[in-house]
UniProtKB/Swiss-Prot annotation:
Keywords: Amidation, Amphibian defense peptide, Neuropeptide, Pyrrolidone carboxylic acid, Secreted
Tissues and organs where the protein is expressed, per its UniProt entry: Expressed by the skin glands.
General function of this protein: Tachykinins are active peptides which excite neurons, evoke behavioral responses, are potent vasodilators and secretagogues, and contract (directly or indirectly) many smooth muscles.
InterPro entries: Tachy_Neuro_lke_CS (IPR013055), Tachykinin_dom (IPR008215)
Keyword Secreted: yes
Gene Ontology CC annotation, any one: extracellular region
Modification sites for Methionine amide: M11
Native organism taxonomy: Eukaryota, Metazoa, Chordata, Craniata, Vertebrata
Main subcellular location: secreted
Family indicated by similarity: Belongs to the tachykinin family.
Identification of the protein by name: Uperolein
Residues found modified as Pyrrolidone carboxylic acid: Q1
Entry annotated with the keyword Oxidoreductase: no
GO biological process, one term: neuropeptide signaling pathway
Length: 11
């Protein structure tokens, strides 16, 4: 499962 931090780093 992809970690939420990776998503925030993209923003």
């Amino acid at each position: 499962q992809p970690d939420p931090n990776a998503f925030y780093g993209l923003m």
